[in-house]
């Protein structure tokens, strides 16, 4: 849809002629239409905001599932993860939250401050480290946990647009003594991932 702006001198030099803002184009209006009304723009008011996000987790492996995130009134997030294996099962997997680019650098992780612990139960930790999840005999892993990361897309610790990643090995929580313990938790390769996006409540 296009729009034109009508402009005129004040007072009108000719009561029957107004010109548009486009050069070389003019429109003629009858005298009874020569008085134009204006209105002020009003700021947009947001009356509701989504407080639910979803990430569908898939990859080159046989691991797939979904993660649903809810934001409560205290601005914490409750995450529900459900993962399934089409064959076999895995006892431990490790989940982290990273930016969408699927690189292997530990710099991908959300780092609110530089710390060397990965346990999701530790008071001071990497904000994107979600710890280990356990699959049952049917190969299904489910977990529920909460942590203080916001949905607000303009904040540096927002989950929107970031990715949830399932790794192939048990995370040693930065305490395993391996050369990769403090960077990736020595959690191995990435089995599945999905980008977090907002969804209607």
From Swiss-Prot:
EC identifiers of the protein: 1.15.1.1
Disulfide bonds: 119-193
Location(s), subcellular: Plastid, Chloroplast
Transit sequence range: 1-47
Binding locations of Cu cation: 178
InterPro entries: SOD-like_Cu/Zn_dom_sf, SOD_Cu/Zn_/chaperone, SOD_Cu/Zn_BS, SOD_Cu_Zn_dom
GO-annotated molecular function: copper ion binding; superoxide dismutase activity
SUPFAM superfamilies the record matches: Cu,Zn superoxide dismutase-like (SSF49329)
UniProt xrefs under CDD domains: Cu-Zn_Superoxide_Dismutase
Keywords for this protein: Antioxidant, Chloroplast, Copper, Disulfide bond, Metal-binding, Oxidoreductase, Plastid, Transit peptide, Zinc
Catalytic activity of the protein: 2 superoxide + 2 H(+) = H2O2 + O2
CC per GO annotation: chloroplast
Superkingdom assignment: Eukaryota
Cofactor note: Binds 1 copper ion per subunit. Binds 1 zinc ion per subunit.
Function: Destroys radicals which are normally produced within the cells and which are toxic to biological systems.
Quaternary data: Homotetramer.
Similarity annotation: Belongs to the Cu-Zn superoxide dismutase family.
Protein name per Swiss-Prot or TrEMBL: Superoxide dismutase [Cu-Zn], chloroplastic
Organism: Populus tremuloides (Quaking aspen)
Name of the gene encoding the protein in the UniProt record: SODCP
């Amino acid at each position: 849809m296009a729009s034109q702006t009508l402009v005129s001198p004040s007072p009108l030099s000719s009561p029957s002629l107004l010109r548009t803002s486009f050069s070389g184009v003019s429109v003629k209006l009858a005298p009874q239409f020569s008085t134009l009304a204006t209105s002020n723009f009003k700021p947009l008011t947001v009356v509701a905001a989504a407080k639910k996000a979803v990430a569908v987790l898939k990859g080159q492996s046989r691991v797939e599932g979904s993660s649903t995130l809810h934001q409560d009134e205290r601005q914490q997030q409750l995450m529900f993860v459900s993962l399934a294996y089409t064959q076999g099962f895995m006892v431990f997997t490790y989940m982290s939250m990273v930016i969408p680019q699927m690189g292997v650098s530990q710099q991908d992780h959300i780092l609110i401050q530089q710390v060397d612990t990965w346990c999701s139960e530790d008071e001071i930790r990497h904000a994107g480290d979600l710890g280990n999840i356990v699959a049952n005999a049917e190969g299904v892993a489910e977990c529920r946990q909460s942590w203080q990361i916001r949905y607000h897309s303009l904040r540096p610790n927002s989950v929107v647009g970031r990715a949830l990643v399932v790794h192939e090995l048990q995370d040693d929580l930065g305490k395993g003594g391996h050369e990769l313990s403090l960077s990736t938790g020595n959690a191995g390769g990435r089995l599945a991932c999905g980008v977090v996006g907002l969804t209607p409540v």
